[in-house]
From Swiss-Prot:
Part of the 50S ribosomal subunit. Homodimer, it forms part of the ribosomal stalk which helps the ribosome interact with GTP-bound translation factors. Forms both a pentameric L10(L12)2(L12)2 and heptameric L10(L12)2(L12)2(L12)2 complex, where L10 forms an elongated spine to which the L12 dimers bind in a sequential fashion. The proportion of heptameric complexes increases during cell growth. Forms part of the ribosomal stalk, playing a central role in the interaction of the ribosome with GTP-bound translation factors. Signal peptide: none annotated. One of its GO terms (cellular component) is cytosolic large ribosomal subunit. GO terms for molecular function: large ribosomal subunit rRNA binding; structural constituent of ribosome. InterPro entries: Ribosomal_protein_uL10, Ribosomal_uL10, Ribosomal_uL10-like_insert, Ribosomal_uL10-like_insert_sf, Ribosomal_uL10-like_sf, Ribosomal_uL10_arc. This is Large ribosomal subunit protein uL10. Residues 314-325 have a biased composition (Basic and acidic residues). It comes from Methanococcus maripaludis (strain DSM 14266 / JCM 13030 / NBRC 101832 / S2 / LL).
Length: 335
């Protein structure tokens, strides 16, 4: 708390203000410094209304905010918090919230609104006046338009702009006369709002450049990373809750392919092995001359008949089981 010293008496309202700021700084886990220097009063009130339920915004003198931040850092034993003052700029204000820094930045960015450009300001982009009626009756405004280089004339009883015209290019200074004309035409080339200077969370201070991300690009990178990690897990056979089913299915398919290729018969591969053998038989028969084939084979070759799937006689099953038992058990256990 600020203590009044004999040689320099501090105004009571300043002490109260610093204490109120300290209370605000201690009330939330996320503290942000924002720049509101160029925000007109009307837009500022609109922004306040938009964010009122999500965060607390408090304006004060920079010297008092600096004092409050430093005292809170000292009282809480948190020197990292004191570094927030390094991001303070003209027209700064404090925001206290529980919203994470990225969501806070997005919310503030979305709360920005278009505004008229001021005379003497630097054009943020090429400012163009479109052709068409201004809706204004003949009068002095016609001369004002022409004075700033906008081709205008009376059209159907109203002042109209003859053609599209770029009146100032990006980076150029907007004259006072042009600013008045653009405002009268309701052209708002400037976006105003609360700009993030620094956001403190758990010992880390984020700047606007840290928080300004392309969401589509960011999500795309996460999806790509997930796909790469998923494929690595499957191919390296490192089971996780997300990949175990795919790994088991891949192992099953690989084992089944080996079984079919090596003609190792199981209840899961018998049909595929028979189908393959049948197809090979038809292919070989097709290479033989007609004299070597009976009528049945000739008919099957000409019709491209599919391999028949026949049920084995009951009495043959016992013998098949004996043959399977004599085969290597390892492969059969996979099915």
């Amino acid at each position: 708390m600020i203590e009044a010293k004999s040689e320099h008496k501090i105004a009571p309202w300043k002490i109260e203000e610093v204490n109120a700021l300290k209370e605000l700084l201690k009330s939330s886990n996320i503290i942000a410094l924002i720049d509101m220097m160029e925000v007109p009063a009307v837009q500022l009130q609109e922004i306040r209304d938009k964010i009122r339920d999500q965060m607390t915004l408090k304006m004060s003198r920079n010297t008092l905010m600096k004092r409050a931040i430093e005292e809170v850092a000292e009282e809480t034993g948190n020197p990292e918090f004191a570094k927030l003052v390094d991001y303070m700029d003209k027209g700064a204000a404090i925001i206290a919230t529980e919203m994470n820094p990225f969501k806070l930045y997005k919310t503030l960015d979305e709360s920005k609104s278009p505004a008229p450009v001021k005379g003497g300001a630097i054009a943020p982009c090429d400012i163009e006046v479109k052709a068409g009626s201004t809706g204004m009756p003949p009068g002095p405004f016609l001369s004002e338009l022409k004075a700033v280089g906008i081709p205008a004339a009376i059209d159907k009883g109203k002042i109209g702009i003859k053609e599209d015209k770029i009146v100032v290019k990006e980076g150029e200074v907007v004259s006072q006369k042009l600013a008045v004309v653009l405002s009268a035409l309701d052209i708002k080339p400037v976006t105003v709002g609360l700009n993030v200077l620094g956001v403190y969370e758990d010992g880390v201070i984020y700047t606007e450049s840290d928080l300004k991300i392309d969401e589509e690009e960011f999500v795309g990178k996460i999806q790509k990373a997930y796909t790469s990690a998923f494929n690595l897990s499957v191919n390296a056979v490192i089971p996780t809750s997300a990949t175990v089913e795919t790994i088991v299915q891949k192992a099953f398919n690989d084992a089944k392919a080996v079984s079919v290729e090596s003609a190792f018969v199981t209840d899961k591969t018998a049909d595929a092995i028979l189908g393959k053998a049948y197809a090979q038989m038809i292919a070989v028969a097709g290479l033989a001359g007609d004299d070597a084939l009976d009528e049945d084979l000739k008919g099957k070759i000409s019709s491209g008949a599919a391999a028949p799937v026949e049920e084995a006689p009951v009495e043959e099953k016992k013998e098949e089981k004996k043959e399977e038992a004599a085969a290597p058990a390892g492969l059969g256990m996979l099915f």
